[in-house]
């Protein structure tokens, strides 16, 4: 498993981000999805293939996290192999090309977010099929090289259920074995909710904050294991 750098999050996830499966991290804007993905890549050995579809990956932010943790900047930053995908077609091609790039030296793949271009497409049926194929490629890579795959996901408002829901919920839920939802309660306070896990009870909650170091536990607030 890969550590998240947070004792509480690791405990919530049964030890950390597991290898050989897809882990979905979803939530509204500015809840910490990108920071969490970067931090996991930062703190674990092995290369990271990072596909940025939103322009959210910030080398400056990553460098600040490295500096704040007293890590060696050169060796750490060189672990990240960054790809940009500006539309859904390019995203599909980039994920497919990972089969030629990823090897045993990689510990993680990140697609942040995998639904950014999906949500603006009109032909949702064909796009969902393509999205499923992309997820299958990622799952194949996860199993072949025993690495972790994090796919971040955006949300939409479901008026019928009066709740925020992850985009492409059915196909994402089918392919992703572990699902983590992030929420912002108030400035400086966020929560992570375990929505699905292969062996941990669903509904566990931990609190965290975002600092210069990245994601950090908030010890003063007792983590709850009850469903929201």
From Swiss-Prot:
DNA damage keyword on record: yes
Pfam families linked: Rad51 (PF08423)
SMART domains in alphabetical order: AAA
Gene3D superfamilies: P-loop containing nucleotide triphosphate hydrolases (3.40.50.300)
GO biological process: DNA recombination; DNA repair
Annotated TM spans: none
Annotated S-S bridges: none
Keywords: ATP-binding, DNA damage, DNA recombination, DNA-binding, Nucleotide-binding
GO terms, molecular function: ATP binding; ATP hydrolysis activity; ATP-dependent DNA damage sensor activity; damaged DNA binding
InterPro entries: AAA+_ATPase, DNA_recomb/repair_Rad51_C, DNA_repair_and_recomb_RadB, P-loop_NTPase, RecA_ATP-bd
Annotated function: Involved in DNA repair and in homologous recombination. May regulate the cleavage reactions of the branch-structured DNA. Has a very weak ATPase activity that is not stimulated by DNA. Binds DNA but does not promote DNA strands exchange.
Family: Belongs to the eukaryotic RecA-like protein family. RadB subfamily.
Protein name: DNA repair and recombination protein RadB
Gene name of this polypeptide: radB
